[in-house]
Amino acid sequence: MYIILITNNNMNKVNSGSRIVFLDYVRVVAIFMVLLVHSIEPFYLGGEGTYVASWGDALWVTFLNSALRCAVPLFVMTSSYLLLPVKGDGMTFLRRRFVRVGLPFAVWTLLYAFIPYWGTEDMSISENLSRLVFNFMPHAGHLWFVYMILGVYIIMPIISPWLERVSQRGERMFIMVWLLSTAVPFLRVAASATGFAEVWGEASWNEFGALYYTSGFIGYIVVAHYIRTYVNWSTVKTLCVALPTLVIGYIIVALPFYLQLPDAYPVNDSIDLAVRWELSWCFTTTGVALTTIALFLLFKLITKPCRIYPFFKHLSKLSYGIYLVHMFVLVAVFGYVSAWGLATPVVMLLTATLTFIISALFVQLLSLLPKSKYFIG
């Protein structure tokens, strides 16, 4: 049982039927990474906002979570690789995406508003509903992703004509400028030493700096299109580029977090402390961008289905439903697993694994219902 890698440049887009094989692997791995991220969060988020019980917990949080920050951008690149450039009418494209993504999102948002987590105290449904007028609910914070991806879909028909006309050099230039924008959060920290945290045109009356319009998740959209259109490398070249990029990216993600860890434990502080620690973990910062691109290139080496591919293909189809439902499952699972007295990394991995299995089985059952696409995607 193995994965066949093909080095022939003409074979880098081999698919099984109408599906691009490696993207199914990306989706399954990325959704598990997301579940693992959320299984790690209780080990540094809690108490007054930030809570770390021990130095050992801090290390596990640092080294494991730093390897997982690319999960969300991988989803963005997967969608972009498949959908760009948008063909046909933009409104038709948006209607299809909003039906496929937006309707299940609306269903599960309401379920999170009305149903409390297992073992939690009663919640205020009226407060939840009033919050939904403006944003996602704090206890369903994972739904931020859907707001973001819907925004990505909105921009896709707009940039598609440019992607169809721009030269390889022009697209590469945009990517380089975008990569520069991923350093802006770190530049703000450096600039704060001068007494001002704004950089390159930012001010109290203008949050749109010089690189604002080339920053954010749009970079992953363009990178995915560039890889599909122009990157037809051999296995050797891919490994020579991707592996060093992965290592460098991981160091940029993990080291700033590690260097901020305190000496005394337990740590119990406001949420602002965790927010400061997480600067290098943000999804559009340099390290996360590099690790995302590197992993995507490595997955792209998978060009033929192996024996386990049908299993991954099926899980890939369930991935959005797993994402929507998993917090209901994870909170209950973590409550049980954390009480078993296991080592910290075992609790993290076991919680994520059990959550993945239970969520997948539940979504599979839901998929058997009529019109299931409207509530699991």
Residue ranges and their predicted role:
Residues 2-377:
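Alpha-helical transmembrane segments and their immediate juxtamembrane cytosolic regions
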